[in-house]
Amino acid sequence: MVPGRPAQRPGPAPRSRAAQEDGTLTLTPGAAADGPSDSAFLRACRREPVPHTPVWFMRQAGRSLPEYRKLREGVPMLDSCMMPEMVAEITLQPVRRYGVDAAIFFSDIVLPLKAIGLGLEIKPGVGPVVEEPVRSAADLERLRVPEPDELDYITRAVRILTAELGSTPLIGFGGAPFTLASYLIEGGPSRNYEQTKAMMFGAPDLFAAL
């Protein structure tokens, strides 16, 4: 033991990886730890000793993978996010190929906007586009709070994944309120957020309500 350094407890056994014919790696679920809470990723999150530096990548499930491009061919982005089996498969693809230390749930931050009754689509090369931006109290009134069962496709996908991932943790994410509000106000991506700033300073109560 190194003087002045706390004793480290043994970490979980290394992952079991097997090479496939196409050169990718297969992760054996459950080989790395007793469960997700004992994984290298969550150990590192808790600042506990780990057997190796855990690795995962931003956008690890996506256009860089040929299997992703094949699966998504002809399927609009928002539609793919609302198909539980497809969400699960896309989420699992980089785990199978690279043996990363965590899976990232395949989704998009604008799904809640779709659920509250807005006309919304993701245009290639542009991003989320809202048909009718929210810029007045009357606009705000037409929005509604979705029922939980209207988002059941997310729950179903998570259930599939937790059954398939074994000891590999699943990372979820969500859009911050300001980000989602700016999409609603601007009607899409913006460089200067002029409409958002105008509401923030000109109608602060409306902005807070939104």
Indicate where each model-derived feature is located.
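Generic structural signal for short, solvent-exposed loop/turn connectors between secondary structure elements
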Residues: A7, P54, G166-T168
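Residue-level recognition of conserved structural "scaffold" positions that shape functional pockets
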Residues: G11-P12, S16-A18, R69, P124, ...
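Active-site-proximal, glycine-rich beta->alpha crossover segments in alpha/beta enzymes
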Residues: E121-L210
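Compositionally biased, low-complexity flexible segments
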Residues: M1-T24
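N-terminal basic, low-complexity leaders that serve as flexible interaction/assembly modules and, when applicable
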Residues: G23-P124
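Residue-identity detector for glutamine
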Residues: Q8, Q20, Q60, Q93, ...
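Short, solvent-exposed coil/turn linker segments
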Residues: G4-P6, P76-M77, S136-D139
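Short, compositionally biased low-complexity segments
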Residues: P12, Q60-E67, G127-V134
